[in-house]
């Protein structure tokens, strides 16, 4: 065939970028031809499938294609039919997706390589999930391109050419298996391009929200650490200020005490010589004080002689002598009565002790009087028992 000699681009590595940006993978031309021949044979055998046209279209991608439309696809022989109206276009897109999935399934079955298995598992026929590369700020301008374009975009072939053995296997496949696989992929849920664009925008917004949440959480953590550090610094500053205040107060108290000591020393420095001489002046001072007391006593006892008053010294002398004799007699009587008074006081103390003992005895007697009725009752009961015993013995 002429198309087998075309140089194909090697497949891209199996990463998130290749899976999320291109929602579907184009088939090689040889596989297209084999698929068209198989479908034509099935359409000739069954009249119900004669109206279906075999074509492999590509789902709309969120990015611009690196290859222009119609440049190399016209040479490869792929049939891209523009849409007449919206209903026929959506039907053709769905048919193309299902057949492309079936072709990918056949390719995986014939090849069995782990890379194709991984790519077929990562790519879904109806939807595409945006990757971190697609959600990057540099790709936002390309993501804003409308998904509902008039014609589907084409991409370069991502699979190597098939061997003649695999082509023969595909051509010799039964029509029943093809119909079952097509029905299985047709029964799956389809996603419209508008919903795909909404999902893509939603993922972008969700990624931005997560980024802002991470930024806010990191700022909150830094602010919390900064707050803790500032609080610690404020606490240590407050502690230092408190210690400085205590130190200043202690210094002020010490200064005030030193000032008072200085004042006391100044006062005592003037009085210390006089205090040292006090031992010599003490006897003279006591004698002068005794003379002063006697003079004051004499002045208080003497009567003033005013208004021509006179005193009979003889009569006063006689009266003073009589008073002194009476005082002496009173003193003698008191001396005589002192032993008697002592005896009387001793007897009074003994009487007080006896009176206290009598009070105790009276209290004991009251208690014994209270117990007399009990004893009498016991005595009567004992007598009754004795009488009963004597009667029983008889």
Curated annotation (Swiss-Prot):
<feature type="compositionally biased region" description="Polar residues">
    <location>
        <begin position="142"/>
        <end position="157"/>
    </location>
</feature>
<protein>
    <recommendedName>
        <fullName>QWRF motif-containing protein 7</fullName>
    </recommendedName>
</protein>
<feature type="short sequence motif" description="QWRF motif">
    <location>
        <begin position="211"/>
        <end position="214"/>
    </location>
</feature>
<feature type="compositionally biased region" description="Basic and acidic residues">
    <location>
        <begin position="97"/>
        <end position="110"/>
    </location>
</feature>
<comment type="similarity">
    <text>Belongs to the QWRF family.</text>
</comment>
<feature type="compositionally biased region" description="Low complexity">
    <location>
        <begin position="14"/>
        <end position="67"/>
    </location>
</feature>
<dbReference type="Pfam" id="PF04484">
    <property type="entry name" value="QWRF"/>
</dbReference>
<feature type="compositionally biased region" description="Polar residues">
    <location>
        <begin position="85"/>
        <end position="96"/>
    </location>
</feature>
<feature type="region of interest" description="Disordered">
    <location>
        <begin position="1"/>
        <end position="171"/>
    </location>
</feature>
<feature type="compositionally biased region" description="Polar residues">
    <location>
        <begin position="111"/>
        <end position="120"/>
    </location>
</feature>
<dbReference type="InterPro" id="IPR007573">
    <property type="entry name" value="QWRF"/>
</dbReference>
């Amino acid at each position: 065939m002429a198309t087998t000699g075309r140089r194909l681009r090697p497949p891209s590595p199996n990463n998130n970028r290749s899976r999320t940006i291109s929602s579907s993978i184009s088939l090689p031309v040889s596989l297209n031809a084999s698929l068209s021949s198989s479908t034509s044979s099935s359409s000739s055998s069954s009249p119900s499938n004669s109206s279906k046209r075999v074509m492999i279209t590509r789902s709309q991608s969120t990015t611009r294609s690196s290859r222009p439309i119609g440049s190399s696809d016209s040479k490869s022989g792929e049939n891209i039919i523009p849409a007449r109206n919206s209903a026929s276009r959506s039907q053709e897109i769905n048919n193309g997706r299902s057949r492309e999935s079936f072709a990918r399934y056949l390719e995986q079955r014939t090849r069995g390589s782990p890379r194709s298995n991984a790519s077929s598992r990562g790519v879904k026929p109806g939807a595409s999930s945006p990757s971190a590369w697609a959600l990057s700020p540099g790709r936002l301008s390309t993501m804003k391109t409308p998904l509902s374009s008039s014609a589907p975009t084409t991409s370069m072939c991502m699979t190597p050419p098939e061997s003649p053995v695999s082509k023969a296997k595909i051509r010799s496949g039964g029509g029943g298996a093809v119909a079952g696989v097509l029905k299985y992929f047709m029964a799956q849920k389809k996603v419209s391009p508008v919903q795909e664009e909404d999902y893509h925008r939603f993922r972008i917004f969700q990624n931005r929200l997560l980024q802002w949440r991470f930024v806010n959480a990191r700022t909150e953590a830094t602010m919390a650490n900064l707050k803790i550090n500032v609080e610690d610094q404020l606490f240590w500053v407050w502690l230092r200020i408190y210690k400085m205040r205590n130190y200043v107060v202690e210094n002020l108290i010490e200064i005030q005490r030193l000032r008072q000591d200085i004042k006391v020393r100044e006062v005592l420095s003037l009085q210390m010589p006089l205090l040292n001489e006090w031992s010599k002046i003490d006897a003279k001072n006591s004698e002068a004080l005794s003379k002063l007391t006697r003079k004051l006593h004499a002045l208080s006892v003497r009567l003033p002689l005013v208004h021509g008053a006179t005193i009979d010294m003889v009569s006063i002398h006689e009266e003073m002598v009589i008073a002194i004799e009476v005082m002496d007699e009173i003193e003698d009587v008191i001396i005589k009565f002192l032993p008697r008074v002592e005896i009387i006081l001793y007897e009074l103390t003994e009487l007080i002790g006896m009176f206290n003992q009598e009070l105790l005895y009276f209290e004991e007697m009251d208690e014994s009087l209270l117990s007399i009725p009990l004893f009498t009752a016991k005595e009567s009961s004992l007598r009754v028992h004795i009488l009963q015993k004597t009667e029983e013995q008889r």
